Regions:
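Flavin-dependent oxidoreductase catalytic core characteristic
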Residues: 1-175
């Protein structure tokens, strides 16, 4: 469900961006519309690598687990999970390896774009039964901020490159 949620959110950003782009071909955009176009273009660019990478990794993990549940026999031709497993492996390559998605997302991680979006989401009211989950996310965000600060303070490009995948995974887990 998390993968589907981020996919829908990304699609929403892309749809709004594309709609405004289409309108701009018909007429001149107002100043407010130009701001919206810029905002949603940035959000679409930021969320696309998260949606692709996260869903590719989830698909790989889920199909791997399906093979394990079948005791390995799910890998032979009679089972659908064999095809799904193969497709999931190819999907992550076709959509760009997860490492390419990390490279595409790291600037939005480093410049605080995702952190700002996460904080905006946390400002919203939630139903009473969801408050413990919100508290848990707030705790995760504190750790995320500490990790970001640690990497920024280090000012070591090798360390930054080494930790990029971990920061990407943290971002995906929180968003």
């Amino acid at each position: 469900d998390a993968g589907r949620s981020i996919l829908y959110q990304t699609a929403r950003y892309v749809d709004i961006y594309k709609a405004l782009e289409d309108i701009s071909r018909e007429r001149k955009l107002t100043a407010e519309e130009r701001q919206e176009l810029k905002k949603y273009s940035r959000l679409a660019d930021a969320f696309t690598p998260l949606a692709k990478g996260m869903n590719s990794e989830y698909a790989n993990q889920n199909t791997y687990d399906a093979i394990q549940v079948h005791g390995g026999s799910g890998f032979i031709m009679e089972y659908k999970c064999q095809r799904l497993y193969r497709d999931a492996r190819i999907f992550s390559i076709y959509e760009g390896t997860t490492q390419l998605q990390v490279v595409a997302a790291i600037r939005y991680i480093s410049n605080g774009t995702y952190l700002g979006i996460i904080k905006e989401m946390l400002e919203k009211e939630v139903a009473e039964e969801l408050k413990p989950l919100k508290t848990r996310v707030e705790e995760m965000v504190k750790l995320y901020e500490q990790a970001l600060e640690y990497v920024k303070e280090g000012q070591d490009q090798e360390m930054h490159d080494f930790l990029a995948r971990r920061l990407y995974n943290m971002t995906c887990e929180i968003i």
